[in-house]
Protein backbone atom coordinates (compact mmCIF):
# COMPACT_ATOMS: atom_id res chain seq x y z
CA UNK A 1 0.00 0.00 0.00
CA UNK A 2 1.05 3.60 -0.54
CA UNK A 3 0.77 5.64 2.66
CA UNK A 4 0.89 9.44 2.71
CA UNK A 5 1.86 11.64 5.64
CA UNK A 6 0.98 15.30 4.91
CA UNK A 7 2.10 18.31 6.88
CA UNK A 8 -0.58 19.50 9.31
CA UNK A 9 -1.99 22.89 8.31
CA UNK A 10 -4.30 23.61 11.24
CA UNK A 11 -3.27 26.72 13.19
CA UNK A 12 -0.15 25.99 15.25
CA UNK A 13 -0.50 22.24 14.84
CA UNK A 14 3.09 21.10 15.16
CA UNK A 15 2.59 17.35 15.37
CA UNK A 16 3.05 14.93 12.48
CA UNK A 17 1.08 11.78 11.76
CA UNK A 18 4.02 9.38 11.86
CA UNK A 19 7.55 9.29 13.24
CA UNK A 20 10.50 7.94 11.24
CA UNK A 21 10.32 4.80 13.40
CA UNK A 22 6.75 4.26 12.23
CA UNK A 23 7.78 4.74 8.61
CA UNK A 24 10.57 2.20 9.05
CA UNK A 25 8.10 -0.40 10.31
CA UNK A 26 5.81 0.06 7.29
CA UNK A 27 8.69 0.01 4.80
CA UNK A 28 9.99 -3.20 6.40
CA UNK A 29 6.63 -4.79 5.61
CA UNK A 30 6.86 -3.80 1.95
CA UNK A 31 4.81 -0.60 1.89
CA UNK A 32 5.76 2.75 0.39
CA UNK A 33 5.53 5.88 2.51
CA UNK A 34 5.45 9.42 1.13
CA UNK A 35 6.03 12.27 3.57
CA UNK A 36 5.48 15.93 2.76
CA UNK A 37 8.63 18.04 3.00
CA UNK A 38 9.19 19.51 6.51
CA UNK A 39 6.11 17.66 7.86
CA UNK A 40 8.05 16.46 10.89
CA UNK A 41 10.26 19.49 11.44
CA UNK A 42 8.31 20.97 14.35
CA UNK A 43 8.23 17.59 16.07
CA UNK A 44 12.01 17.30 15.85
CA UNK A 45 12.24 15.09 12.74
CA UNK A 46 14.07 16.32 9.64
CA UNK A 47 13.42 15.21 6.07
CA UNK A 48 16.78 13.42 6.26
CA UNK A 49 15.48 11.41 9.23
CA UNK A 50 12.64 10.15 7.04
CA UNK A 51 14.86 9.57 4.02
CA UNK A 52 17.16 7.47 6.22
CA UNK A 53 14.32 4.99 6.76
CA UNK A 54 13.42 4.92 3.04
CA UNK A 55 10.52 7.39 3.02
CA UNK A 56 9.95 9.37 -0.16
CA UNK A 57 9.74 13.14 0.29
CA UNK A 58 7.19 15.12 -1.73
CA UNK A 59 7.18 18.93 -1.87
CA UNK A 60 3.47 19.73 -1.66
CA UNK A 61 0.42 18.52 0.22
CA UNK A 62 -1.41 18.03 -3.09
CA UNK A 63 1.25 15.52 -4.17
CA UNK A 64 0.84 13.46 -1.00
CA UNK A 65 -2.95 13.21 -1.27
CA UNK A 66 -2.78 12.45 -4.99
CA UNK A 67 -0.48 9.44 -4.66
CA UNK A 68 -1.59 7.83 -1.40
CA UNK A 69 -4.03 4.97 -0.83
CA UNK A 70 -4.13 5.87 2.86
CA UNK A 71 -3.51 9.21 4.56
CA UNK A 72 -2.22 9.16 8.14
CA UNK A 73 -2.67 12.49 9.94
CA UNK A 74 -3.09 14.01 13.37
CA UNK A 75 -6.00 16.46 13.13
CA UNK A 76 -9.10 16.52 10.98
CA UNK A 77 -8.75 17.78 7.40
CA UNK A 78 -9.60 21.46 7.09
CA UNK A 79 -11.29 23.20 4.16
CA UNK A 80 -8.27 23.44 1.79
CA UNK A 81 -7.80 19.66 2.11
CA UNK A 82 -11.37 18.63 1.36
CA UNK A 83 -10.94 18.73 -2.41
CA UNK A 84 -7.71 16.72 -2.20
CA UNK A 85 -9.30 13.63 -0.66
CA UNK A 86 -10.09 10.94 -3.21
CA UNK A 87 -12.93 8.44 -3.52
CA UNK A 88 -12.04 5.25 -1.68
CA UNK A 89 -9.01 6.80 0.02
CA UNK A 90 -8.55 5.81 3.65
CA UNK A 91 -8.05 8.78 5.99
CA UNK A 92 -6.84 7.75 9.44
CA UNK A 93 -6.80 10.65 11.92
CA UNK A 94 -8.67 12.44 14.70
CA UNK A 95 -11.93 13.70 13.16
CA UNK A 96 -14.27 14.71 16.02
CA UNK A 97 -17.13 14.79 13.53
CA UNK A 98 -19.84 15.54 16.11
CA UNK A 99 -18.45 19.04 16.57
CA UNK A 100 -18.27 19.92 12.86
CA UNK A 101 -21.17 19.46 10.46
CA UNK A 102 -19.31 21.00 7.50
CA UNK A 103 -16.46 18.52 7.92
CA UNK A 104 -18.94 15.65 8.12
CA UNK A 105 -20.71 16.77 4.95
CA UNK A 106 -17.39 17.22 3.14
CA UNK A 107 -16.24 13.72 4.04
CA UNK A 108 -19.58 12.26 2.96
CA UNK A 109 -19.18 14.01 -0.38
CA UNK A 110 -15.60 12.78 -0.77
CA UNK A 111 -16.61 9.08 -0.71
CA UNK A 112 -13.50 8.40 1.36
CA UNK A 113 -13.13 5.90 4.20
CA UNK A 114 -12.80 7.99 7.36
CA UNK A 115 -11.44 6.13 10.38
CA UNK A 116 -11.42 8.27 13.50
CA UNK A 117 -8.78 7.66 16.14
CA UNK A 118 -11.08 8.88 18.88
CA UNK A 119 -13.78 6.22 18.42
CA UNK A 120 -11.55 3.16 18.15
CA UNK A 121 -12.80 1.38 21.27
CA UNK A 122 -11.84 -1.88 22.96
CA UNK A 123 -14.17 -4.31 24.73
CA UNK A 124 -13.40 -2.71 28.09
CA UNK A 125 -14.53 0.67 26.65
CA UNK A 126 -10.99 2.05 26.68
CA UNK A 127 -10.04 4.34 23.79
CA UNK A 128 -6.48 3.31 22.87
CA UNK A 129 -5.86 6.02 20.28
CA UNK A 130 -7.40 8.82 22.33
CA UNK A 131 -5.66 7.89 25.57
CA UNK A 132 -2.12 9.13 24.78
CA UNK A 133 -3.33 12.55 23.65
CA UNK A 134 -5.72 12.71 26.60
CA UNK A 135 -2.75 12.12 28.89
CA UNK A 136 -0.88 14.98 27.25
CA UNK A 137 -3.92 17.28 27.15
CA UNK A 138 -4.72 16.67 30.82
CA UNK A 139 -1.23 17.55 31.94
CA UNK A 140 -1.10 20.54 29.61
CA UNK A 141 -4.51 21.77 30.82
CA UNK A 142 -3.12 22.23 34.31
CA UNK A 143 0.04 23.91 33.00
CA UNK A 144 -1.85 26.42 30.88
CA UNK A 145 -4.40 26.97 33.62
CA UNK A 146 -1.61 27.86 36.02
CA UNK A 147 -0.14 30.28 33.50
CA UNK A 148 -3.41 32.08 32.84
CA UNK A 149 -4.06 32.46 36.55
CA UNK A 150 -1.17 34.93 36.48
CA UNK A 151 -2.29 38.56 36.62
CA UNK A 152 -0.59 39.66 33.36
CA UNK A 153 -2.59 36.91 31.60
CA UNK A 154 -5.92 38.12 33.00
CA UNK A 155 -6.13 35.75 35.95
CA UNK A 156 -6.48 36.33 39.67
CA UNK A 157 -2.75 36.48 40.26
CA UNK A 158 -2.63 33.24 42.22
CA UNK A 159 0.22 30.75 42.43
CA UNK A 160 -1.09 27.19 42.07
CA UNK A 161 0.75 25.83 45.07
CA UNK A 162 0.75 28.98 47.17
CA UNK A 163 3.64 29.47 49.62
CA UNK A 164 3.92 28.82 53.38
CA UNK A 165 1.22 30.88 55.05
CA UNK A 166 -0.72 31.54 51.82
CA UNK A 167 -3.53 29.30 50.60
CA UNK A 168 -2.94 27.50 47.27
CA UNK A 169 -5.24 27.78 44.27
CA UNK A 170 -8.42 25.73 44.16
CA UNK A 171 -8.93 23.58 41.06
CA UNK A 172 -12.20 21.95 39.97
CA UNK A 173 -11.92 19.19 37.37
CA UNK A 174 -15.10 18.08 35.60
CA UNK A 175 -14.72 14.48 34.47
CA UNK A 176 -12.61 11.73 35.99
CA UNK A 177 -11.42 10.03 32.81
CA UNK A 178 -7.90 10.03 31.40
CA UNK A 179 -7.78 13.81 30.88
CA UNK A 180 -9.19 14.60 34.30
CA UNK A 181 -6.96 12.12 36.09
CA UNK A 182 -3.81 13.50 34.48
CA UNK A 183 -4.92 17.08 35.14
CA UNK A 184 -5.52 16.20 38.79
CA UNK A 185 -2.10 14.57 39.14
CA UNK A 186 -0.40 17.67 37.75
CA UNK A 187 -2.44 20.10 39.85
CA UNK A 188 -1.85 18.06 42.99
CA UNK A 189 1.85 17.91 42.24
CA UNK A 190 1.91 21.70 42.00
CA UNK A 191 0.37 21.89 45.46
CA UNK A 192 -3.16 23.03 44.57
CA UNK A 193 -6.35 22.01 46.36
CA UNK A 194 -8.09 19.78 43.82
CA UNK A 195 -11.68 18.57 43.48
CA UNK A 196 -12.46 16.06 40.70
CA UNK A 197 -16.03 15.13 39.72
CA UNK A 198 -17.59 12.23 37.88
CA UNK A 199 -20.96 10.45 37.67
CA UNK A 200 -19.36 7.02 38.02
CA UNK A 201 -19.00 6.12 41.69
CA UNK A 202 -16.73 3.18 40.91
CA UNK A 203 -14.40 5.56 39.12
CA UNK A 204 -14.51 8.02 42.02
CA UNK A 205 -13.57 5.27 44.46
CA UNK A 206 -10.63 4.34 42.24
CA UNK A 207 -9.50 7.97 42.00
CA UNK A 208 -9.72 8.35 45.77
CA UNK A 209 -7.30 5.45 46.12
CA UNK A 210 -4.73 6.39 43.47
CA UNK A 211 -4.58 10.20 43.54
CA UNK A 212 -2.67 12.25 46.12
CA UNK A 213 -4.35 13.26 49.36
CA UNK A 214 -4.84 16.86 48.23
CA UNK A 215 -7.29 15.58 45.58
CA UNK A 216 -10.89 15.10 46.75
CA UNK A 217 -13.67 13.45 44.78
CA UNK A 218 -17.23 14.69 44.29
CA UNK A 219 -20.25 13.22 42.56
CA UNK A 220 -20.99 15.30 39.46
CA UNK A 221 -24.36 17.02 39.67
CA UNK A 222 -25.55 20.51 38.82
CA UNK A 223 -26.04 21.27 42.51
CA UNK A 224 -22.57 20.10 43.51
CA UNK A 225 -20.88 22.00 40.68
CA UNK A 226 -22.72 25.19 41.64
CA UNK A 227 -21.61 24.79 45.25
CA UNK A 228 -17.96 24.68 44.17
CA UNK A 229 -17.91 27.57 41.69
CA UNK A 230 -17.79 30.55 44.11
CA UNK A 231 -14.46 29.41 45.59
CA UNK A 232 -12.61 27.90 42.62
CA UNK A 233 -9.76 29.56 40.76
CA UNK A 234 -9.37 27.13 37.86
CA UNK A 235 -11.95 24.85 36.22
CA UNK A 236 -10.82 22.15 33.80
CA UNK A 237 -13.56 20.65 31.62
CA UNK A 238 -12.70 17.11 30.56
CA UNK A 239 -16.03 15.40 29.98
CA UNK A 240 -16.17 12.87 27.13
CA UNK A 241 -19.02 10.99 25.48
CA UNK A 242 -17.23 8.95 22.76
CA UNK A 243 -18.09 10.26 19.31
CA UNK A 244 -20.83 12.56 20.63
CA UNK A 245 -21.00 16.23 21.58
CA UNK A 246 -19.89 17.12 25.08
CA UNK A 247 -22.61 18.26 27.51
CA UNK A 248 -22.60 21.86 28.76
CA UNK A 249 -21.89 21.55 32.48
CA UNK A 250 -21.38 25.27 33.09
CA UNK A 251 -23.87 27.71 31.58
CA UNK A 252 -23.36 31.41 30.97
CA UNK A 253 -25.59 32.20 33.92
CA UNK A 254 -23.27 30.17 36.15
CA UNK A 255 -20.29 32.38 35.24
CA UNK A 256 -21.74 34.98 37.61
CA UNK A 257 -21.10 32.61 40.50
CA UNK A 258 -17.33 32.78 39.93
CA UNK A 259 -14.97 35.60 40.81
CA UNK A 260 -13.40 37.70 38.02
CA UNK A 261 -10.13 36.22 36.83
CA UNK A 262 -11.24 32.63 37.31
CA UNK A 263 -9.87 30.49 34.46
CA UNK A 264 -11.85 27.90 32.47
CA UNK A 265 -9.85 25.39 30.41
CA UNK A 266 -12.13 23.46 28.04
CA UNK A 267 -10.32 20.31 26.94
CA UNK A 268 -13.59 19.02 25.46
CA UNK A 269 -13.73 21.83 22.89
CA UNK A 270 -12.90 19.47 20.01
CA UNK A 271 -16.19 17.72 20.84
CA UNK A 272 -18.13 20.98 21.10
CA UNK A 273 -17.02 22.05 24.57
CA UNK A 274 -18.46 21.50 28.05
CA UNK A 275 -18.97 25.19 28.87
CA UNK A 276 -21.85 27.04 27.17
CA UNK A 277 -19.63 30.06 26.52
CA UNK A 278 -16.80 28.07 24.90
CA UNK A 279 -15.74 28.51 21.31
CA UNK A 280 -12.55 27.17 19.72
CA UNK A 281 -9.38 29.23 20.06
CA UNK A 282 -5.83 28.76 18.78
CA UNK A 283 -2.36 28.63 20.26
CA UNK A 284 -1.67 32.07 18.78
CA UNK A 285 -4.80 33.56 20.40
CA UNK A 286 -5.65 31.06 23.14
CA UNK A 287 -7.97 32.98 25.45
CA UNK A 288 -10.91 35.35 25.59
CA UNK A 289 -12.95 36.79 28.46
CA UNK A 290 -16.69 36.44 29.06
CA UNK A 291 -18.22 38.19 32.08
CA UNK A 292 -14.80 38.52 33.67
CA UNK A 293 -13.99 34.81 33.30
CA UNK A 294 -10.93 33.78 31.28
CA UNK A 295 -11.69 31.03 28.74
CA UNK A 296 -8.98 28.82 27.20
CA UNK A 297 -10.41 26.58 24.47
CA UNK A 298 -7.59 25.49 22.17
CA UNK A 299 -8.76 22.45 20.21
CA UNK A 300 -5.29 20.97 19.72
CA UNK A 301 -3.64 21.41 23.11
CA UNK A 302 -1.05 18.62 22.55
CA UNK A 303 0.16 20.47 19.44
CA UNK A 304 2.12 22.76 21.76
CA UNK A 305 4.39 19.86 22.80
CA UNK A 306 4.79 18.12 19.45
CA UNK A 307 7.80 15.95 20.20
CA UNK A 308 6.15 14.27 23.18
CA UNK A 309 2.72 14.01 21.61
CA UNK A 310 3.90 12.77 18.19
CA UNK A 311 5.95 10.02 19.79
CA UNK A 312 3.04 9.00 22.04
CA UNK A 313 0.56 9.07 19.15
CA UNK A 314 2.64 6.93 16.81
CA UNK A 315 3.26 4.42 19.60
CA UNK A 316 -0.51 3.97 19.84
CA UNK A 317 -1.58 4.21 16.19
CA UNK A 318 1.17 2.21 14.49
CA UNK A 319 -0.24 -1.30 15.09
CA UNK A 320 -3.55 -0.19 13.56
CA UNK A 321 -1.81 1.59 10.66
CA UNK A 322 0.18 -1.57 9.92
CA UNK A 323 -3.00 -3.68 9.99
CA UNK A 324 -4.79 -1.31 7.61
CA UNK A 325 -1.82 -1.26 5.24
CA UNK A 326 -1.25 -5.02 5.25
CA UNK A 327 -4.86 -6.19 5.13
CA UNK A 328 -6.81 -3.31 3.61
CA UNK A 329 -9.41 -1.44 5.64
CA UNK A 330 -12.24 -3.96 5.28
CA UNK A 331 -10.30 -7.01 6.41
CA UNK A 332 -8.48 -5.09 9.14
CA UNK A 333 -11.78 -3.87 10.57
CA UNK A 334 -13.37 -7.31 10.21
CA UNK A 335 -10.50 -8.83 12.18
CA UNK A 336 -10.51 -6.14 14.88
CA UNK A 337 -13.89 -4.95 16.23
CA UNK A 338 -12.14 -2.11 18.09
CA UNK A 339 -10.79 -0.70 14.82
CA UNK A 340 -14.18 -1.19 13.15
CA UNK A 341 -15.69 1.23 15.67
CA UNK A 342 -13.40 3.87 14.20
CA UNK A 343 -15.38 3.82 10.95
CA UNK A 344 -17.34 7.08 11.05
CA UNK A 345 -17.97 7.98 7.40
CA UNK A 346 -17.51 5.33 4.73
CA UNK A 347 -17.95 5.90 1.00
CA UNK A 348 -20.65 8.53 1.41
CA UNK A 349 -22.43 6.97 4.39
CA UNK A 350 -22.43 7.93 8.07
CA UNK A 351 -21.53 4.71 9.87
CA UNK A 352 -21.17 5.96 13.45
CA UNK A 353 -24.53 6.40 15.15
CA UNK A 354 -23.63 9.23 17.53
CA UNK A 355 -22.47 11.37 14.60
CA UNK A 356 -25.63 10.64 12.61
CA UNK A 357 -27.82 11.46 15.60
CA UNK A 358 -26.13 14.81 16.31
CA UNK A 359 -26.84 16.08 12.80
CA UNK A 360 -30.09 14.23 12.10
CA UNK A 361 -28.43 12.26 9.32
CA UNK A 362 -29.17 8.71 8.23
CA UNK A 363 -27.11 6.11 10.06
CA UNK A 364 -26.05 3.09 8.03
CA UNK A 365 -24.44 0.11 9.69
CA UNK A 366 -21.33 -0.98 7.85
CA UNK A 367 -21.15 -4.55 6.54
CA UNK A 368 -17.65 -6.01 6.54
Please name every model-derived segment.
Residues 118-144, 148-159, 269, 274-368:
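Adenosine-phosphate binding glycine-rich loop
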Residues 69, 75-76, 95-96, 221, ...:
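Short glycine-/small-residue-rich Rossmann-like dinucleotide-binding loops
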Residues 6-7, 11-45, 152-240, 287:
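Glycine-rich phosphate/diphosphate-binding loop of Rossmann-like nucleotide-binding domains
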Residues 209-291:
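Rossmann-like adenosine-cofactor binding region
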Residues 2-110:
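An N-terminal-biased, well-structured beta-alpha scaffold segment characteristic
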Residues 2, 8, 77-169, 298-300:
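Glycine/serine-rich phosphate-binding loop and adjoining beta1-alpha1 elements at the start
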Amino acid sequence: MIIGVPKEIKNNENRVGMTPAGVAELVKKGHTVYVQATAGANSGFSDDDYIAVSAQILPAIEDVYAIADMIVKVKEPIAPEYKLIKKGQVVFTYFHFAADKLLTEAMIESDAVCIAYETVEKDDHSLPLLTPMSEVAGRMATQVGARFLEKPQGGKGKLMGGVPGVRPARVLILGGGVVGTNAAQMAAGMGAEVMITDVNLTRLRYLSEVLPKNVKTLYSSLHNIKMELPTVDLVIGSVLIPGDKAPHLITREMLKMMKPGTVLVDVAIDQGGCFETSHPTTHSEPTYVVDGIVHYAVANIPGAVPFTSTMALTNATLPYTVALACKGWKQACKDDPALALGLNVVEGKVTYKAVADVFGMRYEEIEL
